[in-house]
Regions:
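ABC family nucleotide-binding domain
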Residues: 2-205
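A cytosolic small-molecule/anion-sensing beta-strand core signal
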Residues: 210
Length: 229
């Protein structure tokens, strides 16, 4: 199975601080990998590098077979739009746009706008009945599903989710996890960043960070499913 991404000896230095120190691991296509660690372990710095919001001080980041370690500004933007879907704990929705328009705005940045594709994306996350609703008219779980639809509209190679259920109650957390499990079955590559050990167990493997170092990588033989929450 091919790699969706691979990190080779990644380091990130801020002044005298090594936020990431010699991080190496790979994520196979269609795999769900959970990245875990306590506060200050380097998770946020790693997400910034994986999502091309920042560059490593040293090391190589291979994304879909391409070296994404030191791209110029134009190529970085192109890679981010075409290869990566991002879901955050905060929703970052445009408050005065409808659910449909919030999905379509991601298409504008991709130079291809198709309302039917946006509708299908919302249908896939169970929001076909909320097309004209604004974010303030949606529940927290619905807003996060809208964010997932937006992140998937351009068919990225990998979905990076940073604490995606951090602001949700248990019922909505189950809905989001069920959706991620469905996406994995469809072959989508998922990288979930979380401090919650229970959520980490839904992945095919867990990458543990501590003090900026790779502490352990554990393969999960039988990943959890949402009805076990």
């Amino acid at each position: 199975m091919q790699n969706a991404l691979e990190l080779k000896n990644i380091c990130k230095i801020f002044g005298d601080v090594k936020a990431l120190d010699d991080i190496s691991f790979e994520v196979k296509k269609g795999e769900w990998v959970s990245v875990m660690g306590p506060s200050g372990s380097g998770k946020s710095t790693l997400v910034n590098i994986l999502s091309l919001m920042d560059t490593p001080s040293s090391g190589v980041y291979m994304l879909g077979g391409d070296d994404a370690s030191n791209l110029n500004a134009d190529d970085t933007l192109k890679f981010r739009r075409e290869k990566i879907g991002l879901v955050f704990q905060q929703f970052h929705l445009v408050p005065y746009l409808s659910a449909l328009e919030n999905v379509m705005i991601a298409q504008y940045y991709h130079s291809s706008v198709d309302e039917e594709d946006a509708k299908k994306a919302l249908e896939a996350v169970g929001l076909s009945h909320r097309l004209t609703h604004r974010p303030s008219q949606l529940s927290g779980g619905e807003q996060q599903r809208l964010c997932i639809a937006r992140s998937l509209i351009n068919e990225p190679e990998i979905l990076i989710a940073d604490e995606p259920t951090g602001n949700l109650d248990e019922a909505n957390e189950r809905i989001i996890l069920d959706l991620f499990c469905k996406l994995r079955k469809e072959g989508k590559t998922i990288l979930l960043v979380t401090h919650n050990p229970d959520l980490g167990e839904y992945g095919d493997k867990i990458v543990y960070l501590r003090h900026g170092k790779l502490e352990n990588i554990r393969t999960i033989e039988n990943p959890k499913v949402p009805n076990e929450i």
